[in-house]
Amino acid sequence: MASSRASSTATKTKAPDDLVAPVVKKPHIYYGSLEEKERERLAKGESGILGKEGLKAGIEAGNINITSGEVFEIEEHISERQAEVLAEFERRKRARQINVSTDDSEVKACLRALGEPITLFGEGPAERRERLRNILSVVGTDALKKTKKDDEKSKKSKEEYQQTWYHEGPNSLKVARLWIANYSLPRAMKRLEEARLHKEIPETTRASQMQELHKSLRSLNNFCSQIGDDRPISYCHFSPNSKMLATACWSGLCKLWSVPDCNLLHTLRGHNTNVGAIVFHPKSTVSLDQKDVNLASCAADGSVKLWSLDSDEPVADIEGHTVRVARVMWHPSGRFLGTTCYDRSWRLWDLEAQEEILHQEGHSMGVYDIAFHQDGSLAGTGGLDAFGRVWDLRTGRCIMFLEGHLKEIYGINFSPNGYHIATGSGDNTCKVWDLRQRRCVYTIPAHQNLVTGVKFEPIHGNFLLTGAYDNTAKIWTHPGWSPLKTLAGHEGKVMGLDISSDGQLIATCSYDRTFKLWMAE
């Protein structure tokens, strides 16, 4: 066996290289895709092995995939990102073409005009200039021109709005202005003469008199307390002879009380809603007959009524107000009556001519209180717009603008010295203004709640009385404006106050339906 295997192996000989045939590389034959072949076959209408039903079954089974030729869309967020990149390149291209001023102040002005912060933390002029360039590349250079045009238009509109408009008044107004001028000038001369005489008094004498006054004021006590009505009492006012006190109530009633025993004398019936104020005629109980008009009152329904002392019914009604009348006040002459209204105006009525001679606007909100100068030449008004105005009745001009309160002005009063004005406001303060300096000279942090009324002592103005919603009334020195006495005793808000013409009595009325008289011991 071994010998036979060896012999067989030996008999196999290796073929020479030239006899081996070379390997031929066969070319690839491309028959096309089945999908294209199938499309061609279907286009020619050939049925072949697969019919329409077989083709449909193959497509449904997923064995045959025939595309519709639609292009595969890129995802939405990828396309948005590409758009943002292109937009950023365009913005940078625009930014390079924008010319920005190298003046830093002008750059800041442009940023302010565009409503952007003029500077950022750690930003220098170069960075600020580049920031302006980037902003303009986004909003466009026309935006800066547009803001400048808008600013010019707003300036023009403000200038037009601030223009003073004059309306032609009736001839009766001209007659009244001349009459007031002739009435006030002699009184002003008399007041100045009295001031000169008072200045000639030695300083020691004046100081001792002031000390005595302060001592008596510190000894003020509640002399009488009376329940005045079933509803809150909104206003109180002494008669010129200090023998009577008039009160106004939210029930619509007005009442007259004897002083100092506080007995009810008359009940005046005529108003149907809250009465805002009732005031005595300047000559009532002094030289005026009881049958004449002695009192005037106003109410929230816009009614203003005139009263005599011998009747419980109103003598006359003043018509013309369509909204709430907050206050009424007599001119020192007694011929004119001033009313403040919630239609942003105040009015002056000539009772002798029985007509409205002045309808004065000037406040942006309702006018709440009015006061007349002792001479009769000026009128002061306080409004719910937190501003006060001083008007010259002889010319009709606003001679002083009282700006400084943060909230509504509810009380205003002139000092007998002729140049001080006090205003009480909803910001809990009382401000003292000087007509000569045309500014606020002192701010009294008077109360812990809104101040409802202010009143100077009517003879020399030696002290100032304030009342507020903190249930108290306070007395302040004049000048100096230091606190002297706090009149505490009411259980509700102090809504009104007054000082008798002789300076001996103080009256306060409250939301607790009572009024109180205060007198020195």
From Swiss-Prot:
GO biological process: mRNA splicing, via spliceosome
WD repeat residues: 228-267, 270-317, 320-359, 362-401, 404-443, 446-486, 489-521
Keyword entries, A-Z: Acetylation, mRNA processing, mRNA splicing, Nucleus, Repeat, Spliceosome, WD repeat
Residue positions, PTM N6-acetyllysine: K26
Pfam families listed in its UniProt record: PRP4, WD40
Any one GO cellular component localisation term in the record: U4/U6 snRNP
Subcellular location field: Nucleus; Nucleus speckle
Keyword Acetylation recorded: yes
InterPro entries in UniProt: G-protein_beta_WD-40_rep (IPR020472), PRP4-like (IPR014906), PRP4-like_sf (IPR036285), WD40/YVTN_repeat-like_dom_sf (IPR015943), WD40_repeat_CS (IPR019775), WD40_repeat_dom_sf (IPR036322), WD40_rpt (IPR001680)
GO molecular function: U4 snRNA binding; U6 snRNA binding
Superkingdom, taxonomy of origin: Eukaryota
Function: Plays a role in pre-mRNA splicing as component of the U4/U6-U5 tri-snRNP complex that is involved in spliceosome assembly, and as component of the precatalytic spliceosome (spliceosome B complex).
Assembly, per entry: Component of the precatalytic spliceosome (spliceosome B complex). Component of the U4/U6-U5 tri-snRNP complex, a building block of the precatalytic spliceosome (spliceosome B complex). The U4/U6-U5 tri-snRNP complex is composed of the U4, U6 and U5 snRNAs and at least PRPF3, PRPF4, PRPF6, PRPF8, PRPF31, SNRNP200, TXNL4A, SNRNP40, SNRPB, SNRPD1, SNRPD2, SNRPD3, SNRPE, SNRPF, SNRPG, DDX23, CD2BP2, PPIH, SNU13, EFTUD2, SART1 and USP39, plus LSM2, LSM3, LSM4, LSM5, LSM6, LSM7 and LSM8. Interacts directly with PRPF18, PPIH and PRPF3.
PANTHER family, per database record: U4_U6 SMALL NUCLEAR RIBONUCLEOPROTEIN PRP4 (PTHR19846:SF5), WD40 REPEAT PROTEIN (PTHR19846)
The protein's name: U4/U6 small nuclear ribonucleoprotein Prp4
Originating organism: Pongo abelii (Sumatran orangutan)
Lineage of producing organism: Eukaryota, Metazoa, Chordata, Craniata, Vertebrata
Gene responsible for this protein: PRPF4
